[in-house]
Regions:
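C-terminal and inter-domain tail/linker signature
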Residues: 1-142
Length: 142
């Protein structure tokens, strides 16, 4: 018999995997359904955004400028299921200029990334994304 903590841990891992599965399908509403209404989204080298409307605006910016798929996703979670971490490899194409970044010319890139999650009442309450922005810039500049 498994202790409850292990099942809670499994649910946290499944939640994060569901989030990334929705991402890879381009299912923005599906991603949002997994988030708390007051979700905190901490962008790599960017501002902290709070709430589903801010997250939806972020998704629109991403969809306009990038086509991305995440591969080799590995998710770990605390036994109590309140925290999780993910590591992945981003395979992307830069399709339209994003403010403050080099011009887009359909450049392809592959780079590692990761994220940390806080999970509250079965929903994602915080996402902190990390990747090497300078590495990405070097890849798209060629």
């Amino acid at each position: 018999m498994k202790i409850d903590g292990t099942r809670t841990q499994d649910r946290a891992i499944e939640l994060v995997l569901d989030y990334y599965s929705a991402f890879n399908r381009g299912d923005w509403p599906g991603m949002q359904a997994l988030l708390a209404d007051d979700v905190i989204h901490e962008l790599n080298e960017g501002p902290r955004e709070v709430g589903l409307p801010a997250f939806a605006a972020f998704q629109q910016r991403m969809a306009r400028s990038y086509r991305e798929q995440l591969h080799d996703i590995v998710v770990m979670a605390t036994q109590d299921g309140t925290r999780a971490a993910a590591e992945y490899v981003v395979h992307g194409e830069y399709i339209a200029d994003d403010e403050g970044l080099p011009p887009a010319r359909g450049q392809h890139y592959v780079l590692p990334g990761g994220a940390f999650f806080a999970i509250e009442e079965g929903r994602i309450g915080r996402i902190s994304n990390y990747y090497n922005l300078q590495d990405w810039i070097a890849k798209v500049r060629g």
